[in-house]
Amino acid sequence: MLTINLPKTFKVKYLLIALALFYLILVLLLPAIAVFYEAFHKGVEPFIQAMGDRNFQSALQLTVVMALISVPLNTVFGLCAAWVLARNQFPGRALFLSVLDLPFSISPVVAGLMIVLLYGKNGWIGSWFASWDIQIIFSVPGMAIATIFVTLPFVAREVIPVLEELGPEQEEAARTLGAKDWQIFWRVTLPNIRWGLLYGVLLTNARAMGEFGAVAVVSGSILGKTSTLPIFVEQEYKNYQTEAAFGAAVVLALLAVVTLVLKEILEQRTGHHKAV
């Protein structure tokens, strides 16, 4: 007769839980606590002063601009790509999916170098812009291109499985009833994919605001001009302006917390709708 040593099983279970919690505390929680401590251990006033710095405000504004540019563009692209890939089988589909995932696998620094080679003054495309006295690299357009590159797959990758699970039956039924394509999208497709879409938009926004590597390569990292919040943190820390650096890091951390809360809410809503 098979017997189970329950006390031993429980010991292993709680040992694994303790190890996992210890690892999470050591790798994630303690560094976050350290950042908040360094930002506020002298009181709130240094933090407020850091937030009033013109370079910080410029970095915050530029970070928001990067998100405002990249999120709508990649949302539209992601919806189109997701619909094409979920609703059609065609030669090269696997290649399309592989290229779509490229920003996940390639180093952001390498991505930045690719953009510099292409859009620099001597690049294939950048030389044409240079002839019109338009600067791409070391300016806002280059930073926007880099941000768009690294955030490209998120919406598509969240919407594709939702569309595949949904199937084309409802859309085809609406079409047989005389609905036009735009009516089908707004009244049938979009309501069914809205939570997956919002989840993808949320991830895109979080990555856009937190991106460092690719943007640092193409921006030139000029304080007050081409410095986003992550770049501002790195520059101020290197310049021994620790209060400003940790203050900006706290802002980024708070944005991450808000993202996590919204992510959890969307996951619960998505799970609820799947269950229904």
UniProtKB/Swiss-Prot annotation:
Q: Which CDD domains match?
A: TM_PBP2 (cd06261)
Tell me which residues make up the ABC transmembrane type-1 domain: 60-267
- The keyword Glycosyltransferase is annotated on this UniProt entry: no
| GO cellular component entries | plasma membrane
Signal peptide range: none
Its subcellular locations are: Cell inner membrane
Its biological function? Part of the ABC transporter complex CysAWTP (TC 3.A.1.6.1) involved in sulfate/thiosulfate import. Probably responsible for the translocation of the substrate across the membrane.
**Family under the similarity heading:** Belongs to the binding-protein-dependent transport system permease family. CysTW subfamily.
Q: What is this protein called?
A: Sulfate transport system permease protein CysW
Q: Which organism is it from?
A: Synechocystis sp. (strain ATCC 27184 / PCC 6803 / Kazusa)
